[in-house]
Amino acid sequence: MKRTHLFIVGIYFLSSCRAEEGLNFPTYDGKDRVVSLSEKNFKQVLKKYDLLCLYYHEPVSSDKVTQKQFQLKEIVLELVAQVLEHKAIGFVMVDAKKEAKLAKKLGFDEEGSLYILKGDRTIEFDGEFAADVLVEFLLDLIEDPVEIISSKLEVQAFERIEDYIKLIGFFKSEDSEYYKAFEEAAEHFQPYIKFFATFDKGVAKKLSLKMNEVDFYEPFMDEPIAIPNKPYTEEELVEFVKEHQRPTLRRLRPEEMFETWEDDLNGIHIVAFAEKSDPDGYEFLEILKQVARDNTDNPDLSILWIDPDDFPLLVAYWEKTFKIDLFRPQIGVVNVTDADSVWMEIPDDDDLPTAEELEDWIEDVLSGKINTEDDDEDDDDDDNSDEEDNDDSDDDDDE
C-alpha cells in the first residue's frame, strides 16, 4: 500500500495581540514529548500508557526538503502530545533502519505510517496528518468501544447520527455473555464504526429491538438491517460488519480518507461533491440519499460523498485535477490510478438532476457506457485539434 501522503500540518499561529481567556489556541511550547523508541525501552514505554502512538519513518536523509517534511510531521506530533498530555497517550518515533528488528516484531511494513497500540490491537491511522484530526481520532479511540443508551433523549441523538455505519444491540446487562461478545466485536472497528447498546426495555421497544438482537444501520438509510441468527458470537458479528462495510453512500472523512479512497470498485469511484451547508449542496445531497435508498441492494454501487468544507486545502487541487467548479454540486466517475475523470453535465444550480436522471447516469457508469477512457479520448481530440490549428498556421505563414 504505497502512496504519497498529503500531510497537512493543521497548526494555527496566533497573532501578537493577546487572546481573550478561554480562547487560547495551543501553540507548541518547545518541550520535547515525543521520544525515540527502541527495543531497550519498548516495554517500559508501553506500560506507561493506555494508547501508544508510533510514527514509523525512514531514516532522515541529508536532503533539505525531506528534512523539512520530517520536521513538520514531528511538530504535528509534538503539538498533539502537548494537547493530550493529561491523557494516558504516549508518542514515539520508530526509525525503520535503526529499529528494523522492533518494527518487524510489531508488524510495521509501511514507512511514513502512524500506528496506535491499544491493548493487543494495532490500529493504522490512514487519514490526514493534521493536529486537529489526530487529536479527535485519538480521543475517540481512548473511549469505551460501546456507548450505552438509556433515555429517550439519547435515542434521539442516536437517530440523528446518519453519516456513520452504526450498530445497536439490546442485552440483559453488562454481564451478559452476548453483550461481552458485542463489546469485543466493537473493538475491531473502533473508532470508525459506532457501536451502541441498551439494557433498557423502553429504549429497546422504541427501537424495535428484541433481547440479544443487534441492528445494523447503513449510512443515510431509514431502516436498519436486523442481523440474523441471534444470539451472536464475536466472530459472527465481525464477519457480518466486514461483509457490509462498504455503504451505498458514504462520506469521505479526514481521519480515514486514504483508506476510503483505496476501497474502490474495479479501480473507480463515483464521487459526489456537495457542501452540506450550502442550499444547493444540501438539495443535491438529499437527491443522492434518495438514490442510495432506492439502490441499497446493488452491491456494485457505492457513491463517495465529499463535502469540500471538510478539506479546504484540497479544493484548489481537486478543481485543477478534475477541471470542475466545487462551488457547485458535482458528480463524476474517477479513476483512482491516474485521476482521469468524467463528470455529469449539470447546467446550473437551479437545474439539479432529479433522482431518476441521476440513476440513469449511474447505470451508464456501472454498465461502462460512461467511463474515464472517454476523458482520455477527449484530451486526444483536443491535442489533435491543437496540432491541426498549428499546421494551418504554418501553411498560412508559408503563403
UniProtKB/Swiss-Prot annotation:
Phosphotyrosine found at: Y282
Glycosylation-annotated residues: N335
Signal peptide: 1-19
Pfam families named among the record's database cross-references: Calsequestrin
Main localization category: other
InterPro entries (alphabetical): Calsequestrin (IPR001393), Calsequestrin_C (IPR041860), Calsequestrin_CS (IPR018233), Calsequestrin_middle_dom (IPR041858), Calsequestrin_N (IPR041859), Thioredoxin-like_sf (IPR036249)
Phosphoserine, modified sites: S385, S393
Domain of life where this protein originates: Eukaryota
GO CC annotation terms, alphabetical: calcium channel complex; cytoplasm; junctional sarcoplasmic reticulum membrane; sarcoplasmic reticulum; sarcoplasmic reticulum lumen; sarcoplasmic reticulum membrane; Z disc
Record bears the keyword Ribosomal protein: no
Biased composition (Acidic residues): 373-399
Protein modification: Phosphorylation in the C-terminus, probably by CK2, moderately increases calcium buffering capacity. N-glycosylated.
Gene3D superfamilies (alphabetical): Glutaredoxin
Record's subcellular location: Sarcoplasmic reticulum lumen
Disulfide bonds: none
Function: Calsequestrin is a high-capacity, moderate affinity, calcium-binding protein and thus acts as an internal calcium store in muscle. Calcium ions are bound by clusters of acidic residues at the protein surface, especially at the interface between subunits. Can bind around 60 Ca(2+) ions. Regulates the release of lumenal Ca(2+) via the calcium release channel RYR2; this plays an important role in triggering muscle contraction. Plays a role in excitation-contraction coupling in the heart and in regulating the rate of heart beats.
Family: Belongs to the calsequestrin family.
Disease linkage: Ventricular tachycardia, catecholaminergic polymorphic, 2: An arrhythmogenic disorder characterized by stress-induced, bidirectional ventricular tachycardia that may degenerate into cardiac arrest and cause sudden death. Patients present with recurrent syncope, seizures, or sudden death after physical activity or emotional stress. CPVT2 inheritance is autosomal recessive.
Protein name listed in UniProt: Calsequestrin-2
Gene that encodes the chain: CASQ2
